[in-house]
């Protein structure tokens, strides 16, 4: 089975700026995307967004932290880009 490759948008995704709990949860999400692909219906508040984007919550409370990723693979290439991880207020959706 071919795993998915995960890329990072360096401008918008900076894991070191996340709180420790959110960063740890983000690591789990990335591992799951690499193993099983971008559709993660088992994650809290997961939803598929327009333009092949997906999002879920990685830390509840105030502030809430979310992750946004995009399936950018073409012609059966399994490629996902993490485009954002941060507070809900600044999420690109």
Label every PLM stretch briefly:
Residues 1-31:
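Arg/Lys-rich, positively charged N-terminal/basic patches that mediate binding to nucleic acids
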Residues 16, 57-93:
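Enriched for short, Lys/Arg-rich terminal
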Residues 31-61:
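A short, surface-exposed loop/turn module that caps and links secondary-structure elements
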């Amino acid at each position: 089975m071919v795993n998915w490759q995960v890329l990072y948008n360096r401008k918008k995704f900076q894991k070191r700026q996340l709180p420790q709990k959110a960063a740890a949860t983000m690591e789990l999400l990335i591992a799951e995307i690499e193993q099983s692909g971008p559709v993660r219906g088992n994650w809290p508040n997961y939803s598929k967004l327009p333009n092949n984007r997906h999002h879920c919550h990685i830390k509840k409370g105030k502030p809430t932290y979310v992750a946004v990723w995009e399936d950018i693979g073409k012609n059966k290439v399994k490629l996902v880009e993490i485009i954002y991880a941060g507070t809900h207020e600044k999420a690109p959706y």
